[in-house]
Each structure stands twice: as structure tokens, then as C-alpha cells.
């Protein structure tokens, strides 16, 4: 199991948090995703044999947010 902290711009409310967490949790191999709105970060626990960080970034960007 691996952990990645992603910096995400544009998240400001509960809907943003829900959208990003849901998008990540729907990826096979992601076991948990936790958005911290105060610091604009997402902590993701995942199985690196099933999912790549680039897939997680794409899922976040598909929701309209920028991964920096």
C-alpha cells in the first residue's frame, strides 16, 4: 500500500471535497481519499500495483480541478 499527497487548486466547499473524494474512490486500487480544504491537499491511500498517480491526477482534473 502506498500514500500520495496531491496539491489541488480550486477546491473550496463540501461539494468540491465530495466530488474529488468520490472520483478517486471510484478508481480500482484506491482504498481511501481524504480532502483537506484548508490546505488544498488530497491524501490518497492506494495499491500501486493497480493504479498510477497519473490516473488519480486525471480523475481529479476530470472533475474540473487543477493538480499542481
From Swiss-Prot:
Keywords, ordered alphabetically: Chaperone, Copper, Cytoplasm, Metal-binding
Location of the protein in the cell: Cytoplasm
GO cellular component, one term: cytoplasm
Domain HMA: 2-68
Keyword S-adenosyl-L-methionine: no
PROSITE patterns: HMA_1, HMA_2
Superkingdom assignment: Bacteria
Induction: Induced by copper and, to some extent, by ferric and lead ions.
Binding site for Cu cation: 13, 16
GO molecular function: copper ion binding
InterPro entries: CopZ, Heavy-metal-associated_CS, HMA_Cu_ion-bd, HMA_dom, HMA_dom_sf, MerP/CopZ
UniProt xrefs under Gene3D superfamilies: 3.30.70.100
Keyword Metal-binding: yes
Function: Chaperone that serves for the intracellular sequestration and transport of Cu(+). Delivers Cu(+) to the copper-exporting P-type ATPase A (CopA).
Record-given protein name: Copper chaperone CopZ
Organism: Staphylococcus aureus (strain NCTC 8325 / PS 47)
Amino acid at each position: 500500500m502506498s500514500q500520495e499527497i496531491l496539491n489541488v487548486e480550486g477546491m473550496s466547499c463540501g461539494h468540491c471535497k465530495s466530488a474529488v473524494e468520490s472520483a478517486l474512490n471510484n478508481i480500482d486500487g484506491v482504498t481511501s481519499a481524504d480532502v483537506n480544504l484548508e490546505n488544498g491537499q488530497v491524501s490518497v491511500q492506494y495499491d500501486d500495483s493497480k493504479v498510477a498517480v497519473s490516473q488519480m491526477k486525471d480523475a481529479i482534473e476530470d472533475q474540473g480541478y487543477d493538480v499542481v
